[in-house]
Structure formats: C-alpha cells, structure tokens
Amino acid sequence: MTSPLITKAEVNSVFQGRSLLAEKDFTPAEINYLVDFGLHLKALKQQNIPHHYLEGKNIALLFAKTSTRTRAAFTTAAIDLGAHPEYLGANDIQLGIKESTEDTARVLGSMFDAIERRGFSQKEVEDLAKYSGVPVWNGLTDDWHPTQMIADFMTVKENFGHLKGLTLVYVGDGRNNMANSLIVTGSMLGVNVHIVAPDSLHPTKEVMDIANKFAEKSGAKPLATSNIEEGVKGANIIYSDVWVSMGESNWEERVKLLTPYRITMDMLKMTGNADNGQLIFMHCLPAFHDTETEYGKEIKEKYGLTEMEVTDEVFRSKYARQFEEAENRMHSIKAIMAATLGNLFIPAVPEDFK
C-alpha cells in the first residue's frame, strides 16, 4: 500500500512567505514562538550543530542607515543558515532617489528570495513587501524595530525563564521606535512595560491604544509616566536607549530635558529588586556611558557630561545584559529568517505560553 501524498499546503508553515514589518502584524503566540525558536537556534550554534535551513537562498540587505549589530546579525545569521547575503548601502542602489520603491521592489524581488530594510519610512518597508513578492524584514524604521524585539525578549526569557508578569521599564525618549516597539510587544506577551519619560516625550495615543488593546487579553499593565519613582518601582528590567539619534540637531534641548532620567545605581535601588537577583539592565546600543568615542568627547565638551542615558557604573555592573542582548540579535534574526523563508514544518503555534 502506498503512502498518501502530502501536499505543499498541508506542510506549510504559519510563517512561510510572511514579512515582519511591525510586531503587531503577528499574533502574541507567533512572537513568542520566534523568541523560543531563537533560543533553540542559539543552542544549536553553541553546540556546533549545522542548521542550513536557507541553503541556496539569496538575501538582499538594504541599509539607508549605518549599522553595527543589525548588519552583522543579518550577515552572520544568513551565512549560518546557508544563505548568501548581499549588502546594498545607500550609495549602492537608487531606492527612492532615481527609482521608486515599487520599481526597486519588483526588481529585487525577481532576483532575491528575501529583503531586509533598515531605513526611515515605515511606508517604504511596507511598499517593499507589497511589491517585491518575497518576505521583507524590517531592520528598523522611525516607527518600529521588530527584529530588536525578538532579541530583547529572548534576553529577558533567558534571564528569568518566563515573560508573563515581569515588569520592564524603559527610561528616556518615550516617543522613539524602541519605546513604541517595547510597549506594544510587552503588552502582547504579558510583560508590564512602563515608559518613564518627560510628559512631552510620552508615546502617542495611537501607540498606547495598540498596547492597551493587546494588554486586555494578556493581562499586561502598560504605563507612561514622568514620575521616576512610580515608574521604576517593582522593575525587573531597566532599559535605555540613546537620547538623541545621530544626525538630529536638538541635542541641547533633549539633554536638558532627559538628564534627570539618566539611569544610575540609585535608580536601580528604587526598583526594590536590586538585591534579590530579580533585576537586569538592558540597552540596544550604542550607548553614551563614557567619553571613549568622538560623540562622547563632543558631549563632554559641549555639555560637561561624561555620561548620558546611563552611568558607566551601571553599564559595567552585574546587572548589565546589553552584550548578551546584542549577541541575541543574530540568533533572533536567524529565527525570523528561517521561519519565514525556510519551508519549515510549523503548522501551528501554541497559544499558551509563559
């Protein structure tokens, strides 16, 4: 008796062919699956077990911004998976300058199996996905940073063994892409995300509405507050990002506004978890914690500051997990790429997770 044929539809993955443009486009269970898959692939890497799920695939890496972690992570992840990554920087292609996003997408989609884009406009990355016909992965836009989120919550899960019920406090500019992504993703996964920032730098109503909608189902309690003591109380994770992005001009105003929100050891003690092993510090990097960079020296010269968003003491402390977090960019991006392009057998994802 011959075995029944299994059609492609029957073995198709719930992720196959999909783009990751923003966290909210996936279900909470799917985001959690990618977190766990990233942890699995990290274990395979550590044990030198091959996992060439993308053998023969070609991947375009489109960068409009400079990058250390995202570029390195996508490159090494693609190679580990057996794929060939091709870096195309701002000076290499005509995207948005001499050629429309639609035309560029159609051309690249005919040559590459998937596209990563790190740029500015969310609409641009959405148009790449719309017209290319291949999976597109958002490596960062002004609105969202979804690949960073898989790495971040991988790091949290590695350290605490679970996600639901934890409290993550982001301190700094609450209007940027990191704050947006953290409060939405945390609300999806049952993590209480507090944005601690001056009132003028709180997330938009639109972002808070998205977070609150997910929180209704997950039980998370998202919060935006300017009160540092209230915001950090009970925190398990204190998270920071740069106060001003490279190329922005409003440094003086932003530095003055955010200096009271610098992460210090005293702030960590305010959490109530500094001495019980239930507190870590995270930062998506780069960080201005000393004067060992050109920007650090410029900041010291202009504002008399040797540290900005985080003190060097905290950055180098026992709480610090930013380099573990940075390594996890590679493992998490590998999970995203393999799940959406690798023709893996993932017919469903469990709805219940910790």
UniProtKB/Swiss-Prot annotation:
Q: Which InterPro entries match?
A: Asp/Orn_carbamoyltranf_P-bd, Asp/Orn_carbamoylTrfase, Asp/Orn_carbamoylTrfase_sf, Asp_carbamoyltransf_Asp/Orn-bd, Orn/put_carbamltrans, OTCase_ArgI
Q: Give GO terms: molecular function aspect only.
A: amino acid binding; ornithine carbamoyltransferase activity
Which Gene Ontology biological process is one annotated for this entry? L-arginine biosynthetic process
Q: Which Pfam families match?
A: OTCace, OTCace_N
Key word Transferase present:
yes
Task: State the compartments where it is located.
Answer: Cytoplasm
What the entry lists under PROSITE patterns is as follows: CARBAMOYLTRANSFERASE
Q: Which residues bind carbamoyl phosphate?
A: 67-70, 94, 118, 145-148, 284-285, 329
* Binding residue positions for L-ornithine: 177, 241, 245-246
Please give the pathway this protein is involved in. Answer: Amino-acid degradation; L-arginine degradation via ADI pathway; carbamoyl phosphate from L-arginine: step 2/2
Query: What are the entry keywords?
Result: Arginine metabolism, Cytoplasm, Transferase
Q: What's its EC?
A: 2.1.3.3
The protein's annotated catalytic reaction(s) are: carbamoyl phosphate + L-ornithine = L-citrulline + phosphate + H(+)
Task performed by this protein: Reversibly catalyzes the transfer of the carbamoyl group from carbamoyl phosphate (CP) to the N(epsilon) atom of ornithine (ORN) to produce L-citrulline.
NCBIfam families per the UniProt record, alphabetical: orni_carb_tr
Kindly give the PANTHER family that the UniProt entry links to this protein: ORNITHINE CARBAMOYLTRANSFERASE, CATABOLIC, ORNITHINE CARBAMOYLTRANSFERASE, MITOCHONDRIAL
What family name appears in the similarity comment?
Belongs to the aspartate/ornithine carbamoyltransferase superfamily. OTCase family.
Q: What is this protein called?
A: Ornithine carbamoyltransferase, catabolic
Please give the organism.
Lactococcus lactis subsp. lactis (strain IL1403)
